[in-house]
């Protein structure tokens, strides 16, 4: 979870510097790392070739299957993770930049997502 929290902090700094694509990338990875930590903490993650966190699509699918559909996390958290991935695709692979408002919203949502994953799956671990 520490990696997710660091990425969240980086996203906020990049946003304040006006780097909307960089902020969007870091916010997405904050959520990716938090989702992966939640899967591992829940016993649904694996290390190695079966690790759902090896790819974005694998992680999103595993998160939806094992945590959202089981009711361990809300559907809203699943939607946020999917939206973050969509915005990162624009930030990293499209000629146009992410809109400033979308980047702001994503950074805010990443902070909420990481906090929710920590509270639900790693409440006793120290925050970074």
Predicted regions and their residues:
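Terminal alpha-helical segments
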Residues: 1-128
């Amino acid at each position: 979870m520490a990696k997710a929290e660091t990425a969240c902090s980086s996203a906020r700094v990049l946003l304040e510097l006006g780097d909307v694509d960089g902020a969007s990338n870091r916010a997405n990875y904050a959520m990716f790392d938090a989702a992966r930590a939640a899967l591992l903490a829940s016993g649904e993650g694996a290390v190695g070739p079966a690790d759902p966190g090896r790819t974005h699509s694998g992680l999103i699918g595993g998160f939806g299957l094992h945590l959202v559909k089981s009711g361990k996390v809300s559907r809203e958290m699943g939607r946020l993770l999917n939206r973050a991935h969509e915005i990162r695709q624009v930030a990293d692979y499209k000629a146009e930049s992410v809109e400033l408002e979308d980047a702001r919203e994503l950074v805010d949502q990443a902070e909420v997502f990481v906090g929710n994953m920590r509270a639900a799956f790693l409440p006793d671990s120290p925050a970074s």
